[in-house]
Amino acid sequence: MMKALVVVALLVTLISYSSSEGIDDLEADELLSLMANEQTRKECIPKHHECTSNKHGCCRGNFFKYKCQCTTVVTQDGEQTERCFCGTPPHHKAAELVVGFGKKIFG
Protein backbone atom coordinates (compact mmCIF):
# COMPACT_ATOMS: atom_id res chain seq x y z
CA MET A 1 0.00 0.00 0.00
CA MET A 2 2.81 2.39 0.88
CA LYS A 3 4.56 1.69 -2.44
CA ALA A 4 1.37 2.54 -4.32
CA LEU A 5 1.08 5.90 -2.53
CA VAL A 6 4.72 6.70 -3.30
CA VAL A 7 4.22 5.83 -6.98
CA VAL A 8 1.02 7.93 -7.17
CA ALA A 9 2.76 10.87 -5.46
CA LEU A 10 5.66 10.57 -7.87
CA LEU A 11 3.31 10.51 -10.88
CA VAL A 12 1.39 13.54 -9.62
CA THR A 13 4.65 15.42 -9.10
CA LEU A 14 5.90 14.54 -12.59
CA ILE A 15 2.60 15.49 -14.23
CA SER A 16 2.40 18.82 -12.40
CA TYR A 17 6.03 19.58 -13.27
CA SER A 18 5.57 18.79 -16.95
CA SER A 19 2.33 20.77 -17.16
CA SER A 20 3.95 23.77 -15.49
CA GLU A 21 6.73 23.67 -18.10
CA GLY A 22 4.06 23.53 -20.79
CA ILE A 23 2.31 26.52 -19.25
CA ASP A 24 5.61 28.41 -19.09
CA ASP A 25 6.17 27.65 -22.78
CA LEU A 26 2.66 28.88 -23.60
CA GLU A 27 3.23 32.05 -21.58
CA ALA A 28 6.52 32.66 -23.37
CA ASP A 29 4.87 32.15 -26.77
CA GLU A 30 2.02 34.45 -25.77
CA LEU A 31 4.47 37.10 -24.60
CA LEU A 32 6.40 36.92 -27.88
CA SER A 33 3.14 37.24 -29.80
CA LEU A 34 2.11 40.29 -27.79
CA MET A 35 5.53 41.85 -28.33
CA ALA A 36 5.23 41.28 -32.08
CA ASN A 37 1.76 42.86 -32.10
CA GLU A 38 3.07 45.85 -30.14
CA GLN A 39 5.94 46.22 -32.61
CA THR A 40 3.42 46.19 -35.49
CA ARG A 41 1.35 48.86 -33.76
CA LYS A 42 4.42 51.05 -33.34
CA GLU A 43 5.27 50.72 -37.02
CA CYS A 44 1.81 51.55 -38.38
CA ILE A 45 1.04 55.00 -39.75
CA PRO A 46 -1.34 57.10 -37.59
CA LYS A 47 -4.40 58.96 -38.90
CA HIS A 48 -3.64 62.10 -40.96
CA HIS A 49 0.01 61.09 -41.49
CA GLU A 50 1.58 60.52 -44.90
CA CYS A 51 1.38 57.00 -46.35
CA THR A 52 2.64 57.64 -49.90
CA SER A 53 5.51 55.17 -49.55
CA ASN A 54 3.55 52.55 -47.54
CA LYS A 55 -0.08 52.46 -48.70
CA HIS A 56 -1.00 49.39 -46.62
CA GLY A 57 0.61 50.51 -43.36
CA CYS A 58 -2.17 52.58 -41.80
CA CYS A 59 -3.14 51.93 -38.18
CA ARG A 60 -6.54 50.77 -36.93
CA GLY A 61 -9.16 53.28 -35.83
CA ASN A 62 -11.94 52.67 -33.33
CA PHE A 63 -13.82 50.23 -35.56
CA PHE A 64 -11.98 50.00 -38.89
CA LYS A 65 -8.44 50.16 -40.22
CA TYR A 66 -7.62 53.56 -41.69
CA LYS A 67 -7.27 53.63 -45.47
CA CYS A 68 -4.51 55.33 -47.42
CA GLN A 69 -6.27 58.06 -49.41
CA CYS A 70 -4.37 59.68 -52.26
CA THR A 71 -4.78 62.98 -54.10
CA THR A 72 -2.88 64.59 -56.94
CA VAL A 73 -1.10 67.78 -55.92
CA VAL A 74 0.14 70.36 -58.41
CA THR A 75 3.29 72.15 -57.26
CA GLN A 76 4.17 75.78 -58.06
CA ASP A 77 6.37 74.48 -60.88
CA GLY A 78 3.35 72.80 -62.47
CA GLU A 79 4.48 69.28 -61.55
CA GLN A 80 1.84 66.79 -60.51
CA THR A 81 2.70 64.53 -57.62
CA GLU A 82 0.64 62.03 -55.70
CA ARG A 83 0.32 62.63 -51.96
CA CYS A 84 -1.36 60.13 -49.66
CA PHE A 85 -2.51 60.18 -46.04
CA CYS A 86 -4.19 57.73 -43.69
CA GLY A 87 -7.81 58.56 -43.09
CA THR A 88 -11.30 57.24 -42.54
CA PRO A 89 -13.30 56.67 -45.75
CA PRO A 90 -16.80 58.26 -45.84
CA HIS A 91 -18.66 54.94 -45.58
CA HIS A 92 -16.63 54.04 -42.48
CA LYS A 93 -17.41 57.45 -40.97
CA ALA A 94 -21.12 56.81 -41.57
CA ALA A 95 -20.92 53.38 -39.94
CA GLU A 96 -19.09 54.82 -36.92
CA LEU A 97 -21.74 57.56 -36.64
CA VAL A 98 -24.57 54.99 -36.68
CA VAL A 99 -22.83 52.80 -34.10
CA GLY A 100 -22.13 55.82 -31.87
CA PHE A 101 -25.75 56.94 -32.15
CA GLY A 102 -26.94 53.41 -31.36
CA LYS A 103 -24.71 53.28 -28.27
CA LYS A 104 -26.18 56.57 -27.02
CA ILE A 105 -29.75 55.35 -27.50
CA PHE A 106 -29.38 51.79 -26.22
CA GLY A 107 -26.65 52.52 -23.73
UniProtKB/Swiss-Prot annotation:
UniProt-recorded name of the protein: U1-lycotoxin-Ls1b
Localization: Secreted
Family, similarity comment: Belongs to the neurotoxin 19 (CSTX) family. 04 (U1-Lctx) subfamily.
MF terms in GO: toxin activity
Origin: domain of life: Eukaryota
Comment, domains: The presence of a 'disulfide through disulfide knot' structurally defines this protein as a knottin.
GO CC annotation, single: extracellular region
Keywords linked to the UniProt accession: Disulfide bond, Knottin, Secreted, Signal, Toxin
Tissue: Expressed by the venom gland.
